[in-house]
């Protein structure tokens, strides 16, 4: 996965919150759906996820128990320093948030525990 695509425009209006609506669908505060397209694991320590904003027909919301175990958290919340804090209290770095030909992608990377 490239560190930052060279084509496209940077997006600065990041979602304040992303929470799991159903399996493989996250919803932001504006009711936009984000789908985790790629999950990358390196050396068991580095986890990255590429999220794409898509128009999808939403099913019924699911509880964490219904969603089941996942490498990804149930929720992310944007902090003032530009990082996301997840429901398990870990921090994720926003590597990039871009729009190419109307398609919006966001790459998040799990930060190591301090």
Swiss-Prot record:
Subcellular location: Cytoplasm; Nucleus; Microsome; Endoplasmic reticulum
InterPro entries referenced in this protein's UniProt entry, alphabetically: TCL1_MTCP1 (IPR004832), TCL1_MTCP1_sf (IPR036672)
Claim: Secreted is one of the keywords in the record: no
Stored Pfam families: TCL1_MTCP1
Tissues with expression: Restricted in the T-cell lineage to immature thymocytes and activated peripheral lymphocytes. Preferentially expressed early in T- and B-lymphocyte differentiation.
A single GO molecular function term of this UniProt record: identical protein binding
Positions in coiled-coil regions: none
Domain of life: Eukaryota
Record has Endoplasmic reticulum as a keyword: yes
Quaternary assembly: Homodimer. Interacts with AKT1, AKT2 and AKT3 (via PH domain). Interacts with PNPT1; the interaction has no effect on PNPT1 exonuclease activity.
Known function: Enhances the phosphorylation and activation of AKT1, AKT2 and AKT3. Promotes nuclear translocation of AKT1. Enhances cell proliferation, stabilizes mitochondrial membrane potential and promotes cell survival.
Similarity comment: Belongs to the TCL1 family.
Protein's name in the database: T-cell leukemia/lymphoma protein 1A
């Amino acid at each position: 996965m490239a560190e930052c695509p060279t084509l496209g425009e940077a997006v600065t209006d990041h979602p304040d919150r992303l929470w799991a609506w159903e399996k493989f669908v996250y919803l932001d505060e504006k009711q936009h759906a984000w789908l985790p397209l790629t999950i990358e694991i390196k050396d068991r320590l580095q986890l990255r996820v590429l999220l794409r904003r898509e128009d999808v027909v939403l099913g019924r919301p699911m509880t964490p128990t219904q969603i089941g175990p996942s490498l990804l958290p149930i929720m992310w919340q944007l902090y003032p320093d530009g990082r996301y804090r997840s429901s398990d209290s870990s921090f994720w770095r926003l590597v990039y948030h871009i729009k190419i030909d109307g398609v919006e992608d966001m790459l998040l990377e799990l930060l190591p525990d301090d």
